[in-house]
């Protein structure tokens, strides 16, 4: 069996052309590859990064309250897709996004910030930080309902994922060891719905913000995937501030050079 190193994972993706697998216009492997690699590592070396936990009832209520705030920013120059990871400044006590706060002050801009660890640190008083709790609330609720009622569309998507991704998961079992079919197929179907809902939400934001440039802090966030797709559709340039390359084993920051996908930004600002 092979070890689940990033080099072996990239070689596996290249051999099986994983990132080119497309269902309903979505490159479904690419949208879930971080979690796939994490699942392999969890079953083999027992180590993962960034495992997501479900939202509690109180967290969902708080998100719903945050979601009531309307989006009022129009015709901005730069739209930042923040990652919600604010660091407390020991001198000022203010929680700062070290990757985009300062540069955002220099432009007519807005920072979209999704919940981090199911919440938000108090931002730094800037009036251009907008919480995207509405789409996080919508996606969590929608996916729970879709799982419960197992609609015809979900059944069709499950069949498509089983057909196209199932053989790749079998190959993972052969090369890396773990059998991930039962766990990952429904999770990948869930991800398709997350993208559906997030893309619709982000489209409404773009209608108002009408940015000249979109800068993503973490391209593997749902809003970043959706904004990259929309940017390609609408002719809006997208770029990622690739701070993550400081961690060369961190799966999402590594792609094979030949993988040019609509879900990825146009440029990397390293």
Q: Which ranges hold each PLM region?
A:
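Catalytic-core helical/loop segments in enzymes performing group transfer/polymerization on anionic/lipid-linked
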Residues: 1-270
